[in-house]
From Swiss-Prot:
This is Urease subunit beta. The gene is ureB. The lineage of its organism: Bacteria, Pseudomonadati, Pseudomonadota, Gammaproteobacteria, Pasteurellales. Heterotrimer of UreA (gamma), UreB (beta) and UreC (alpha) subunits. Three heterotrimers associate to form the active enzyme. Pathway: Nitrogen metabolism; urea degradation; CO(2) and NH(3) from urea (urease route): step 1/1. It catalyses: urea + 2 H2O + H(+) = hydrogencarbonate + 2 NH4(+).
Length: 101
């Protein structure tokens, strides 16, 4: 093995298997682009994004870690959300939860 070398298993990595998902239509009603990262609590995103927030409670974007989705002004886009794992305790973001879901 060479220092820094990766030894990866064959095949595709399956992420979020068995977790609840939901697809939502999201519209950016603002006049600026809005970008949301992979692990941001979607329920607490910028309020210029219009969607069913109750369905997004406890959910994040179902995209690879470190990725993001960008919403241009006036753009409508369907996104898939996946439930947070672990103990389902969420702090920070817009401080709308700050505790257990």
């Amino acid at each position: 093995m060479i220092p820094g070398e990766y030894q990866l298993a064959d095949g595709d990595v399956q992420a979020n298997v068995g977790r609840k998902t939901v697809k939502l239509e999201v519209v950016n009603s603002g006049d600026r682009p809005i970008q949301v990262g992979s692990h941001y609590h979607f329920f607490e995103t910028n309020h210029a994004l219009k969607f069913d927030r109750l369905q997004a409670r406890g959910m994040r974007l179902n995209v690879p870690s470190g990725n993001a989705v960008r919403f241009e002004p006036g753009e409508a886009k369907e996104v898939e959300l996946v439930e947070f794992g672990g103990n389902k305790v969420i702090y920070g973001f817009h401080n709308e939860i700050d505790g257990k879901l």
